[in-house]
């Protein structure tokens, strides 16, 4: 983030305005989300820009970015597929689902397809243990009971929707 766009600054201002002036650092998560929406990921340079804007030490912003798995710390594909691999999902084929997706798309975990359409990564608990294995698409859409046939169907549907 070499320079903050006027639109990004306007959006940051709107988030900061929700807090008392002496607590503007409370908007850090919202500002990081805005960066990610505009750029697709949160770079170290963007973290420094957010830190400067909010008057925070850069390490404090970096701690937020690295603590929450919703912030992409490297470029990702158009469709980011997070597969839960915590114990309840593991017991119901979560790891198998992850490996199936990776094999189908020809990537390792955390990898992005050569065409930039898919990134596949393991995930911490997504909070739907009874529906295991579960998968989250682009940090927004949760899908349950993701058997291999359902995973194959998802990949084909997303490929058809790719830009």
Regions found by a protein language model. Name each.
Residues 1-163:
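Signature of N-terminal electron-transfer/Fe-S-associated modules in redox systems
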